[in-house]
Amino acid sequence: MLDVKDLRVQFLESPHKWAVDGVSFHMDEGELIGLVGESGCGKTVTAMAMSGLLKKKDCRYEGTVKLDGQEMLDTDRDNIRSLQGTKLAVVFQEPLTALDPVMRVGPQIEEAIIVHHPEIGDVERKKLAFEAMENAGLYDLETVYNKYPHQLSGGMLQRVCIAAALISKPRLLIADEPTTALDVTTQAHILAILKRINKEQGTGIIMISHNLAVVNALCKRIIVMHKGRIVEDGPAEKIMKAPKDEYTKALIAAIPTKEKVYRCKEDSY
């Protein structure tokens, strides 16, 4: 479904450094992949390339990114727009940034339908919005539909963004650190929603995170990035039990355990 080959991205403000340096991987239909690494490792830039969000005025890039054979780099913006929201959707880290603060959330959820299926009427469109909201774990749908973003909690806002991404039933969902700003309970709910969407709808998901424990809880395959490159790629269980790269080993060692928490408490006294 998705083929990334020798992707390299360099921002014009940093002409001597590649933000992404030779990234290649293949994703099959319905796969659930975790893309993990520290801040600045290139994972979000890779996601921007996959979703057709890179702009030539900001960066130069090489390689190919193909979704169902359609090139996502160096292609007509109308072609990219026809894929975004239909075959491909993105859930960003900060929902308050992704959502329009002066617009009720209902019409924002419906936006992909309005753009790509203008023939669908208001009643049917609202029905599709409610279905997507329910799939995203929202309740009291009529009330939420008519709220403004600032009237909802962080967890509910992220569910709204997931609903907006799901309404057109994309084949690939890129979730760019969707749980980072949430408390652990809400985080677990969002992860459960993503896993259910993958299982029930067959939606391929790329989960981007700096938290290896979160990615391991959700994904069957993990890709580890460091300094713009992929340093490890394989089944989650194998990587967690027998990592080969030193950076991956360091990420695993950084995962909190009860023993580490107790040790920190003792050291603080």
Question: Residue ranges of each PLM-predicted region?
Answer:
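Conserved ABC transporter NBD signature motif
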Residues: 59-71
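Hydrophobic anchor residue at the start of the ABC signature
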Residues: 109, 162, 186, 190
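Conserved ABC ATPase "signature" region
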Residues: 71, 123-143, 252-253
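A short, proline-enriched helix->beta-strand linker immediately N-terminal to the Walker B motif
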Residues: 167-171
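A short, surface-exposed alpha-helical micro-motif characterized by mixed small hydrophobic
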Residues: 215-217
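ABC ATPase "signature
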Residues: 233-234, 242
